[in-house]
């Protein structure tokens, strides 16, 4: 019984470590829900979050209004901010997230999310 418990504990710890967002090169990391071809809720303050180096300024720029939003990552590298979204439409947009290195999400649509 102890061997099974140790094996399950070790497997769980390895799973947690492999799913944690580690970065050695100052690159923005985003949860899998943020990607190319996503849809954001129209006319709201949409939350965007991720990981960067600890205590680093992060800038998010949206193409629909060319506005930049800023946040600072905490001591563990986590950051979060909200962006205003426009009315629904068929125009694809981009979101660029940067902490010195940029990540651009493309083909973002705005609409109703149920």
Model-found features: residue ranges?
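A generic short-segment signal for beta-strand/edge and adjacent turn/coil regions
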Residues: 18, 27-30, 64
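Extended acidic/polar, glycine-enriched regions
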Residues: 49, 53-114
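Bacterial N-terminal signal peptides
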Residues: 9-20
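Non-catalytic, glycine-rich low-complexity segments
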Residues: 25-54, 108-114
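Positively charged n-region of N-terminal signal peptides that target proteins for export
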Residues: 1-7
